[in-house]
């Protein structure tokens, strides 16, 4: 399980602009929620239907402004090794026969390797994890529990939600670009760390944020490869 980051996103601006933002995101999310089976709806109280909709309808969806390519869904990180790569690694490792056999049996096929190469060429990444870290700032979409909600005040709209390990800074930058009339203030709390940002529609800041996360992710990836190669 990850360390969870508690996020509070404060959206400030004219009420009409905030309402337009809230409606556009709610409509996007609503289209993704799987409807209940008609027979179930007919045989259960209305409060059950409302509870279902509440439990499966998130308040925030990062795909709203930064959609993850569907082709990356179900991919694996880090990328599996091909048979040739495994045999090359075996020269520098004292794997026993069973260990080497297992690795070869689970090796990446040439066909799958070509498919992953194509994904990386198209999207910059061949797996969902690395793409999410750089484009969303966290490995999963926004996570919601009973303490996650939306609060409306006269001055702002407040969204509370959780993310894994880190705050979704690139997502908030992208919101600010998509809705330049609004100001987005993200406050987060992680174990031993907290922070605040106020963001407006500045594309350069968004690209700078993505670049920093990309460089960080590449460093982590190289460290992970060294660890995995030593096993």
Task: Describe each model-derived feature in a short phrase.
Residues 1-231:
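Intrinsic low-complexity, intrinsically disordered or marginally ordered coil/linker segments
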